[in-house]
Amino acid sequence: MSKKENKKYRIGMIGLGTMGCNLLLNIADHGFSGAGYDKNADKVSMLDQLGRGKNLKGFTDINTFIKNLESPRALMMLVPAGKIVDDVIADLIPLLDKGDIIIDGGNSHFIDTERRSTALEKIGFHFFGMGISGGEEGARTGPSMMPGGDKEAYKDVQHIFEAISAKVNDEPCVTYIGPGASGHFVKMVHNGIEYALMQLIAETYEILKKGLRLDNDAVHNIFDQWNKGRLQSFLIEITAEILSFKNADTDHLLLDDIRDEAKSKGTGKWTSQVAMDLNLPIPVIDIAVSMRDLSKYKSLRTKAANIYDGVQGGPLTEKPDEYLINLEQAYSFSMVTTYAQGMHLLYKASETYNYNLELDQIAKIWRGGCIIRSTFLEDIYSAFQANEKLEHLFLDRSVQSILKNSLQGIRTVVADAATYGLAIPAYAASLNYFDAFRSERMPSNLIQAQRDFFGAHTYELIGKDGVFHSEWNSNVKT
């Protein structure tokens, strides 16, 4: 980077929605000056109002905004993923100088980030994509951030992001992830893990309500208690809070009034699609995506409930207090499996795309600020610290201990739910993945024989090199 000129604002933010505005306020709180741009005058006014007394300034004119940034300029975009990112970049290029830095802080698809990085580098601009997790509160008080791409560009603003990030043991929850689109890839997988954990918690809620017939206060107390122990996590914490939040209009639980149709922005789907492209199984994440899709078919589900008598669900036991031991084990088992699948995908992507990911450092920056932060991330960090070449968390000794100690609980819960007609597909996917993973010989030999039978796709033999084909039965017609 060249020597900076003495201009007013150190960093610029394009897009002053909740995330962009809160990040700028966070930046100002840590002693850095910032400028914000948005076409919406109300959002600019809001920034100026909230930033009163801070070294912040909002602009509705992009030319004036650009002129008021230090050089070389550092600009972050926080706009919706897709075409709008390309449109903003196209608007910026004529106004910037070579050597300026553009940062995409949104949830862009990593393939798009790779394309943009290559194109901007060719014309002399620095660019990197940075995944940001923590929601609006994290943006304001300290998010977890995953920057990947132009390393020299990141170094120029590294001190800013380290200052504004969440801290765990006084260590910043941000680190340079790797080259290319690695930052956005890691954020995508983070979101896939998030989908799966949310689905597991929803299924836990289903078991507690329909399977154990507990009231809302009891369910709240269980999640609150879990959050004080080894299952502590941000998502468990907010679930406990949700289960005590009353509707101001009716004075009963707001959760009971919310429609059971879950929306999404697509990052979970992207994770599943990429994993399939890499031939790597992440079934807990996959089923979490599918269940959100199924939730949208409310009218069909209502018709089916009338035909098939709906879900009775239980009671699974006459001793719910004792049964909670099984459920806690089941959640622990499935949570570990979810993280293991996500980390395995990162391992595979690192090899495939030459990202050179340091999985211990990724686990480290996920310990604070982000949506999937949990006590278990300390175990993940330790596992990859002990063995940087660890391919799968199931091979780590401490993780093995958790899985073995939780196995009875997950088997009991999945079996009982199936018996009583409770849908807990993420729990079931966790158990089935584990059982298949530990199978030295799977029944896939039959699939290969079938493929060769109807399509002459060939097969391989144990102890012999090469591929083979058989004329299985010339009398069978397909």
What are these regions (language model features)?
Residues 169-180, 213-314, 356-416, 423-424, ...:
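C-terminal substrate-binding/catalytic lobe of Rossmann-fold NAD(P)-dependent oxidoreductases
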